Each structure stands twice: as C-alpha cells, then as structure tokens.
A protein has these predicted regions:
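Basic/polar N-terminal segments that are highly enriched at the extreme N-terminus
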Residues: 1-3, 19-28
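Bacterial N-terminal signal peptides that target proteins for export
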Residues: 1-11
Length: 328
C-alpha cells in the first residue's frame, strides 16, 4: 500500500493561503462543520487525536464536533454515526470500529452529501477512490502504517529477547482493521527469526482484565515464555498486569502498541519494556486539513501516513520523545 507522507504544517499553510486566494465561495465566506467520531471517547489515543484535530480546526476557522461511544463497538458507534449524519455536517472523520459493519451507514452519509474520511481505522481494504468494490467511496484514509508498526514491534521484541524463545500476540478481536494489520506485520517480521516461536494469538475483547488472565494462562502452559506484543492499549496494559501478577518482570518482555501515560508508567515500573507510539495528534490534524482541502475544491490524496516513535526506559524522559506521549 502506497503511503503519502505530507508535512502537516506546510499543508495547513498552503490551505490558509488558498483561502485568501479563493473567490466569493471560498472558506472565508462559509463556515464549515466537521464531525470527528473516534473509535471510543475514553482512550488517550483518540483524546490526543481530538486535540490535533481541534488545532487544525482553530487555524482554519472550522467548527469541529467530537462525538463517540464509550466502547470500541460497532453496535454503539453506528447510532452515534446516524445521529451525526442527521445533523448534516459538511464532513465526517471517523475511526470505524469494524471494517465491514460500518460500510453501509457510511455509504448513507456519503449519499446524503457528507464527505467521508476515515482516520486510524478503515473500511473494506482501505483502498479508496479506486472505482472498485463497495467500500472505496471515502475520500481518504489517514493513519499510521499498521503493518509497518507491527514489524517495528516484532524487531524490538526480537532484540529484547535475544532473538530466541516463545512469544504471542495479545489482540482485541478479529476484523478490526488496525489491529489485524499490526498482528499481520508482527508475524510477517517474526518469520525472519527462526529461533522465535509465535504462539496462538489471544483475543481479549478490549478487556485488560481478560488480557491479564490470558497472560497468566499462557505463562502457566509455557514457563519459557519470552515475550508478548500487546496490539493496542488494553491488550498491552493487561499483559503488563499479568506479568506483574506473575512476578515475571524482566523474564517476559512486553512490547506495547500506543503510548498513553499509563503505558509510560508501566515502562518506568519495569512492567512494559517498549512502546510503539503512534502520532494521533498528526492524524487528527491531517484529517481536518484534508477535509477542509476537499471542501474548498482541492484534490486530496486517498492515503496519508503518519509515523512512529519507539519509547523505552532509555529515552522516556527525552523532551523529543515525551511530546509523542498521548494526552489523558
């Protein structure tokens, strides 16, 4: 999948100039409303994304509406989406909680004239504006390259365990686009390490307590367990709790995907060894800027990628790294 890496500040600056160039139907004469629907409202990742989106909205004179469900669940997200569609914003930025179940309601949004952009997660296969399939209608997908993120996590864990031993993935549930890809990238990269055995993935339904219990069960069956990759916040924090409860700190290495304050605290406490931080503020910022670009008549790329920062005990207090720790 090809990635478009665009400097957010330059992109926003170009748009601000565009607003000044445009004629009477420009953004200066119309107040746009953009809705941001996160995967869930209580996760530090999405809170940080909201802050990035708000920064762009303020700079561009856009009204930003933030509304979501408290749980990462399509059954809870779809009613929120339908309510937002009823208010007829100019654009919707959404982190779909299922790559198939959100297709139909998002089609309804697009059919009603609302521009649709997905952030963090995608629908279908994430390839938009191709003219093929029933889920290519969103304008753009803005996110981390999650396959690459999984590969980075695998390399970090392999190094931490001396490139040998048993590991497993603690994951949410199947059919979540981002975590599916992180697991895919992790397993793909681990094939390069013949002395590492990847055990069966443990799905925890985004429940940290369940992830902790699963760690204890896997560890009981595999006393030589060397590492765990937590594919999202609750998977990683649950695995870390399991490590602590099993007195396995130092013996079993934990790599976390995402870097809220709680994960940082676990790094400092020795329960988590490494965190792969996404840049959610950039995702939110790009989302608003991309929506604004489209609404003001500019073409936008169908895919925009953001980066990662690897955090461990050696750099967790470095100011250049701390800025990528998520907001609570």
């Amino acid at each position: 999948m090809k990635r478009w890496h665009i400097n957010a500040s330059l992109f926003a600056g170009a748009l601000l100039l565009f607003a000044g160039w445009n004629d009477p139907v420009s953004a200066a004469d119309k107040k746009y409303t953009i809705a941001l629907i996160p995967g869930l409202t209580t996760d530090a990742f999405y809170i940080t994304m909201h802050k990035g989106a708000q920064a762009a909205a303020t700079a561009l004179g856009v009204d930003l509406v933030f509304q979501g469900a408290p749980k990462f669940d399509p059954e809870q997200q779809v009613p929120v989406l339908n309510a937002v569609i009823g208010r007829k914003p100019d654009a919707i930025l959404i982190a779909p909680t299922d790559k198939t179940q959100l297709v139909s309601p998002l089609k309804n949004a697009a059919a009603s004239g609302i521009s649709v952009i997905t952030v963090d997660t995608f629908i279908g296969n994430g390839h938009y504006q191709t003219g093929t399939g029933d889920a290519d209608f969103p304008l753009s997908y803005i996110a981390s390259d999650n396959i690459l993120g999984g590969q980075i996590a695998a390399r970090a864990l392999a190094k931490a365990i001396g490139e040998k031993g048993k590991v497993y993935v603690s994951n949410v549930k199947p059919n979540v686009s981002t975590t599916d890809q992180r697991e895919e990238g992790f397993k793909l990269e681990m094939k390069k390490f013949p002395n590492i055995t990847v055990l069966e993935t443990q799905f925890n339904d985004d429940d940290a307590n369940k992830a902790a219990a699963q760690f204890q069960a896997v560890y009981a069956r595999n006393s030589d367990l060397a590492g765990v990759f937590g594919a999202n916040l609750f998977s990683a924090s649950g695995a870390a709790n399991g490590v602590r409860q099993s007195n396995a700190q130092g013996k079993v290495k934990v790599v976390a995907f995402d870097a809220p304050q709680s994960i940082v605290a676990d790094i400092k406490a020795g329960n988590i060894d490494i965190a792969i931080a996404q840049h959610p503020a950039e995702i939110g910022f790009y989302g608003v800027v991309t929506a604004y670009a489209h609404l003001t008549g500019q073409s936008v790329p169908p895919l925009i990628g953001t980066g990662f920062t690897v955090i461990d005990k050696t750099n967790v207090d470095d100011p250049n790294v701390k800025k990528f720790i998520y907001s609570d």
